[in-house]
Amino acid sequence: MQQLLEEAKIYALSSSPVMIYGQAGIEDYLIAEAIHNNSDRRNGPYVSINMRGMDIEKQMEALFSREDADPEGANGGRGAMLKADRGTLFIKGIEHLTLRVQHQILRTMLSRAMMRTDAQPIDALDVRLIGSSKVNLQKLVKQGKFSEELKLVI
């Protein structure tokens, strides 16, 4: 594990998205947090979210919600993308994302902006994405279950 954390420091030097494969339990969380803490984004927010077991509505809400109407809610009305602005977003279990959510993430990452659903202007975003998967994403791409474009971006 110590060797992986040392390697994380190398990835921290880049601002590119990172994909962590094969780590189970909390190891991927520790690696992602080490990348963030050693990066130039260390003073920005670090947001982690686990996609396992979420249906499409929960995935969309967890990542892209912009409403401030529910301050009592788990996300305080704001999705992980907005919370991670100027910081790092770690998505554990990225293989569990639906294709629709994958395409929304891809569009957000490429445009560096998020279209609001409440008719407000576009929110500019500066988020570094770190994903983790126990499954080889290339296999899922071949099965039509994962976006090849998103795989190339991360």
Model-derived segments and spans:
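Conserved post-Walker A coupling segment in P-loop NTPases
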Residues: 7-72, 82-88, 93-98
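Conserved catalytic core of Hanks-type protein kinase domains
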Residues: 83, 108, 153
